[in-house]
């Protein structure tokens, strides 16, 4: 039975890390290159991989860098020197905290800004905390920023698809592909480095040993890889389940081409109400966070960082592999808990970047994203309460937002808006003559929001007679 022995010098381990960085970096560059070629071929445009430089974007990047550095400094101050000693003795823990906000920067602003912010965060943290500088940790942060930026590129790429249902499915497939690819890369690299560091024979079984009193245990390399595989499969299954929940929840409540979201429900005061929702984006946010947390955990925290932990601490490579595996659930949950609410708050910045990328090569007067399709259509829908939008208008509106649609897609788009306008027409025809206008809670509602009595407007009769011309924009009250 073979056991890992650190017979190879530390320089050999770091060489493996540099090779790993070079290979992953090259793969990302090749991906971006071919993606740009495909966009030129299919969409007749060249997408930028960085957002438009402006005061707001620069301020946000600087804020993320400052917050990442301050988190480390605050922890050092609160722990009374304990955290400082931990970060200096085991700098890999400091890097793990840094990487959380590096991911946010890359996801918001793309791989190029992700590289810059990652290197800046690591340098500043080392300077202000007095920690140990290691080029491997800088490279790990850079890879994390690039991986997060690739996720942003994937989301932008799928948003160019005309059919929303196809766009959602394409994003799921690409996200699942990234998770599975990260597992394959991690498996290959961990096995290769471990075999190189051990007196490996083809018939031997490599054993990883953890010796840190009072906890001592060992695990075979094969079992180690199986645990990583099971984790990746659980994540993939979770992503697929979320996709089906998204599809079921949106069933009969969305249009594939116009990308309208609406919801109908019965109420005592009227037959039904149609809501147009433009912020139903929880699926993309959750999938973003899960994919990013999984890929960075496997490719960076498990496959890459342990190499340089060995350099800075003197512990064996198998020791750090097992330490990272033990802390993997905590790191994964911490990523989701921290990144998701931050992305929820910064989503407008992210969507602003999508608008810039999606419209940069369009005419100068038109800078709209797919979400702006709704803001263009809504005034037309309201103004055509008793008319159907004609085909020519649909074509013009579609061309202002996206690439030219095929005749079949234009026909589908026209049919969708015919149905939408019919829904509005039904609302305008509702007879509310005998319905008393009031503020919430509704007097006849089966589930009132409050128990207090409704307040009736002084000019109720006038409101009833002019319920279709309310200046606030509502069709009916």
Swiss-Prot record:
InterPro entries assigned to the protein according to its UniProt record, in alphabetical order: Asp/Glu-ADT_sf_sub_c, GatC
An example Gene Ontology biological process: regulation of translational fidelity
Q: What is its main location?
A: membrane
Q: TM segments? A: 23-43, 61-81, 108-128, 131-151, 171-191, 228-248, 285-305, 326-346
The protein's matches in SUPFAM superfamilies, at most eight in alphabetical order, are given as: Glu-tRNAGln amidotransferase C subunit
Instruction: Give the subcellular location.
Output: Cell membrane
What topology does it adopt in the membrane?
Multi-pass membrane protein
Is Transmembrane found in the keyword set? yes
Gene Ontology CC: one annotated term: plasma membrane
Keywords from the UniProt entry:
Cell membrane, Membrane, Transmembrane, Transmembrane helix
Database matches in Pfam families: GatC (PF02686)
Look up the coiled coil feature and give its residue ranges: none
* NCBIfam families reported in the protein's UniProt record: gatC, PRK12821.1
Q: Which family does it belong to?
A: In the C-terminal section; belongs to the GatC family.
| UniProt xrefs under PANTHER family | GLUTAMYL-TRNA(GLN) AMIDOTRANSFERASE SUBUNIT C, MITOCHONDRIAL
What protein does this entry describe? Answer: Uncharacterized protein MG098
């Amino acid at each position: 039975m073979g056991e890992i022995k650190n017979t190879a010098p530390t320089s050999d381990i770091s060489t493996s890390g540099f090779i790993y960085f070079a290979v992953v970096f090259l793969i990302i560059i090749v991906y971006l290159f071919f993606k740009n070629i495909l966009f030129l071929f299919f969409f007749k445009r060249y997408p930028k991989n960085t957002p438009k430089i402006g005061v707001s974007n620069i301020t946000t990047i600087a804020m993320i860098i400052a917050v990442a550095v301050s988190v480390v400094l605050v922890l050092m101050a609160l722990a009374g020197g304990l955290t400082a000693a931990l970060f200096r003795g085991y700098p890999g823990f400091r890097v793990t905290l840094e990487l959380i906000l590096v991911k946010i920067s890359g996801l918001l602003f793309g791989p190029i800004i992700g590289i810059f912010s990652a290197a800046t965060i690591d340098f500043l943290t080392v300077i202000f905390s007095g920690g140990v500088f290691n080029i491997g940790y800088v490279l790990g942060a850079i890879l994390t920023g690039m991986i997060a930026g690739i996720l942003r590129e994937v989301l932008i790429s799928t948003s160019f698809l005309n059919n929303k249902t196809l766009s959602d499915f394409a994003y799921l497939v690409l996200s699942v592909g990234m998770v599975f690819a990260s597992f394959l890369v991690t498996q290959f690299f961990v096995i290769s480095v471990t075999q190189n560091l051990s007196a490996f024979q083809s018939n031997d079984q490599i054993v990883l040993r953890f010796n840190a009193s009072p906890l001592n245990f060992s695990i075979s390399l094969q079992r180690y890889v199986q645990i990583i595989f099971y984790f990746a499969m659980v994540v993939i299954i979770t992503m697929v389940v979320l996709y089906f929940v998204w599809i079921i929840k949106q069933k009969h409540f969305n249009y594939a081409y116009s990308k309208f979201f609406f919801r109908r429900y019965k109420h005592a005061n009227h037959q039904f109400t149609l809501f147009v929702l433009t912020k139903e984006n929880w699926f993309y946010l959750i999938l973003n966070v899960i994919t990013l947390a999984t890929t960075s955990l496997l490719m960076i925290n498990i496959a890459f960082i342990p190499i340089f932990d060995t350099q800075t601490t003197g512990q064996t490579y198998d020791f750090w592999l097992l330490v990272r595996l033990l802390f993997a659930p905590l790191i994964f949950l911490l990523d989701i808990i921290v990144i998701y609410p931050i992305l929820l708050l910064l989503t407008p910045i992210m969507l602003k970047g999508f608008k810039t990328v999606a419209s940069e090569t369009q005419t100068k007067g038109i800078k709209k994203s797919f979400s702006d399709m709704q803001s263009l259509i809504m005034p037309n829908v309201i103004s055509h309460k008793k008319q159907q939008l004609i085909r020519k208008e649909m074509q013009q509106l579609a061309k202002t937002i996206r690439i030219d649609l095929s005749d079949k897609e234009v026909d589908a788009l026209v049919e969708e808006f015919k149905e939408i306008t019919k829904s509005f027409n039904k609302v305008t025809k509702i007879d509310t003559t005998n319905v008393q206008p009031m503020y919430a809670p509704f007097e006849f509602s089966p589930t009132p929001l409050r128990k207090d009595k409704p307040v009736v407007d002084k000019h109720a009769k006038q409101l009833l007679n002019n319920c279709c011309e309310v200046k606030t924009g509502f069709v009916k009250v």
